[in-house]
Structure formats: C-alpha cells, structure tokens
Amino acid sequence: DFYAIWMEERGLWSTDEQDALQLIDKELDIYAKENKEKFDAHVKVLHMWDAESGMIDSWHKYCQKQMRDNFHTLDDKLIFSNTDTTKEDYASKRLNYPLEQGSIAAYDKLMSTLYSEEERRKLEWAIGSIVTGDSKHIQKFLVLYGGPGTGKSTILNIIQDLFEGYYSVFDAKALGSTSNAFALEAFKHNPLVAIQHDGDLSKIE
C-alpha cells in the first residue's frame, strides 16, 4: 500500500495519498502541455482524480503488487521549524518552534520550585536525550511518583508541548496484560516519546 511521497515544496514527506495523486496529475498535465507538438491528435490526460479513467485502480495495483519495497521509518528524529531538511531526513512533520538560544527564566523558576537539583537533572537528561536522538539507543523509561501537587503532571505537560506530534499516550496496565491484543497500538508509529498520566505499573514485571 501507499506509504509516503516526497514533497519538494514543503521539504517534507507526506503520508497523505491525496498529495501523491495531485502531484502525479500535475506532472501529467505539465508533460502533456510541453509535448503537445509531438502528438497529431488531441491529447486526453488520464487523471488520477477521474475514477472513469481507471488510473486510480492501476495506481493501487502498482502500490500493492509492483512497487519495489523501499520502506523507511519516518520521523525518527526531531525536526524543528528552522531545520533544513532533505529526503534523507525522512521527516513528515516539524515542531512549531525553532531550536535556538533564548531566555529560560520562567522555566528555570518553575523547575527549581518543583524539583530538587538531582530530580531536575534526571528529568532534563531524559529530555536532552530525546532532543539529541540518543533516547532511541538508551531506551529507558522514567516513573514520576508522589502526592498531588508535586509536579508530576507539570513536567509531563511540558514534555508533551516540547514534542508535539512526536509522542503518543499509552496504557501501562494494558502492556502487562496477555489478553489485550491492542496493548501496543500506541507504539505502531514509533513515537519518540510515550507518556501516561496516572499510570498503573502493578502488572509490569
């Protein structure tokens, strides 16, 4: 089946098949216009959007049976709003903010209020490993515990805001269940971060 197509104007891959169909139709129109002198009769372009042309069926058959298998995982690293991308980055999305220096005064005040220096260092180490890409090789998970108002949800919300589009929400209890066939559903797109607020780890050994 169709997986993704490179969109040069965006500098990103697209997993939306409609983008592929529109791009193919556009290229067909350009070819027909540039080569009309080569044809004696009127040229009719068999567009993808026209179901009666049969091209959409041929396209699906090609994707399913004839296209060479060249699968590559998308979005396995962070792309910031100011990151220059190429095909080889295999990115289909960007974060909505740039990676650049700035003031962290408000963040610094919040973190120093909620967490001890040691706890903060561990949390920021984990966040940093995601930014650098090391988390894919480290593959660790953090458990935040404590009473209400101790900052558990605060840092998780910050992480979600930092990695919008790159995280998923999972159910720890379901992961430890042998009867839940969809326990790993949250990980099917290989998110860089998986988060659960108020999780139950009693089933994980």
Regions found by a protein language model. Name each.
Residues 1-18, 71-192:
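P-loop NTPase catalytic core of nucleic-acid-dependent motor ATPases
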Residues 1-90:
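Intein modules and their embedded homing endonuclease domains
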Residues 190-205:
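Conserved AAA+/SF3 P-loop NTPase catalytic/coupling segment centered on the Walker-B
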